[in-house]
Amino acid sequence: MKLLKAIRDADALRPNQLSTPRKAEILMVLEHRIAEMMGAEAPTLKVSVEDDTASVEDMELLLPDGHNECYHLYLAAQLDAYNQDSALYSNDHAIANEAVADAMAWWRRENRKESKGNWKV
């Protein structure tokens, strides 16, 4: 999934006035968590988040297509927090965290280290 598509999907869920660079910065927080779990280098945002009129470079996000709902759910929850809508934030945050946990569990299952066969009981 691309960064700007995740932002567009979240905007469809929660119309808002937050600038695209700020939304990209919010998504980079999640992307850093995912990169740390994968042992990959976290991507960096190549735009100043202070400049609300700056255009954001589109980049490929780390999670594959089967788990890309994590991004727009996470961003929607953070938009609820920004708008101080605590009732929506609680629900959306729980749903987003569950989606992220499922994606991380899937990644760990698919990318296990080879077992050396040494078991101690």
Give the residues covered by each predicted segment.
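Conserved short "hinge" loops at termini or chain/domain junctions
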Residues: 1-59, 104-121
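Short loop/turn elements at secondary-structure junctions
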Residues: 12-21, 66-68, 72-121
